[in-house]
A protein has these predicted regions:
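N-terminal "domain-start" segment that seeds a small globular fold
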Residues: 36-80, 106, 110
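C-terminal motif of bacterial Sec signal peptides marking the signal peptidase cleavage site
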Residues: 26-28
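Thiol-/selenol-based redox modules, centered on thioredoxin-like
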Residues: 181-224
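Structural micro-motif
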Residues: 157-161, 176-186
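Bacterial N-terminal signal peptides that target proteins for export
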Residues: 3-18
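Short active-site neighborhood of thiol/selenol oxidoreductases, capturing the structured segment around
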Residues: 79-109
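Structural microenvironment flanking redox-active thiols in thiol-disulfide oxidoreductases
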Residues: 100-156, 168-172
Length: 224
């Protein structure tokens, strides 16, 4: 009888200890979740939506073709260099303003994923990353890393140029400065004419990839 009582007491003790361990583990899991401060980093493509139905809302921008940007190798690139045989989708991100913008990396990820569809429509893409000074050039690497993570499937390169607008010269020429830059999208035809210009008022205020493809389809359907 004593042995039976002793065994029962031992079992209850082990069960109690197990319950304490499980409770501690669960509490640890709860604490390991993201804090409110980290929540912005968790915004993913599925959580971000851009506009399918948009109309041009901005002036074409004087001298847009001859704006000069710099790629990661230090080579100067102008929009003029990319037209002629192709249309051009020119996209301005917000740039580096103390953090990597999740909306910008998500949008650029969408351009990477849908680049084949854009290319099939006879078009090239140029993404501009504005920075205030040359010392911030390394932030482009951080931006691209965030973009590749969102793209998934082992993506490590972009199929189109991503360039720096050092000193916000292009941003100021187009009148799109706000903090750094307002989100802006320009579509140029093969002749260099701006056929669509959209400047957003917030980070999510951009034409969706669907809207861009629709604009490119319009160009493709034109005679000549």
């Amino acid at each position: 009888m004593f042995n039976a009582i002793s065994k029962a007491s031992s079992i209850r003790s082990r069960l109690g200890a197990t319950s304490v361990i499980v409770a501690a583990l669960l509490a640890g899991c709860a604490r390991s979740g993201p804090s409110v401060a980290d929540s912005a980093d968790l915004i993913g493509p599925a959580d971000i939506h851009f506009k399918d139905d948009v109309t041009a809302n901005a002036a074409p921008g004087d001298g847009l073709l001859d704006l000069s940007f710099v790629d990661q190798a230090g080579k100067a690139i102008k929009p003029r260099d990319l037209i002629g045989k192709k249309n051009l989708v020119l996209v301005f991100t917000r740039g580096y303003n103390g953090s990597i913008c999740p909306y910008c990396s998500s949008y650029t990820s969408g351009l990477i994923t849908n680049y084949p569809a854009i290319s099939q429509r006879g078009s090239e893409v140029l993404v501009v990353y504005p920075i205030t000074k040359p010392d911030h050039a390394q932030r482009l690497d951080e931006f691209l890393k965030a973009t590749f993570i969102r793209s998934g499937d082992g993506v490590t390169t972009t199929p189109f140029p991503v360039v720096l607008d050092i000193g916000l010269k292009g941003v100021d020429a187009l009148g799109i400065r706000k903090d750094l830059a307002k989100p802006a999208t320009y579509i140029l035809d093969k002749g260099g004419r701006v056929r669509f210009a959209y400047v957003g008022n917030s980070l999510s205020d951009r034409p969706s990839i669907k809207a861009i493809l629709k604009q490119l389809d319009t160009l493709r359907e034109e005679p000549g």
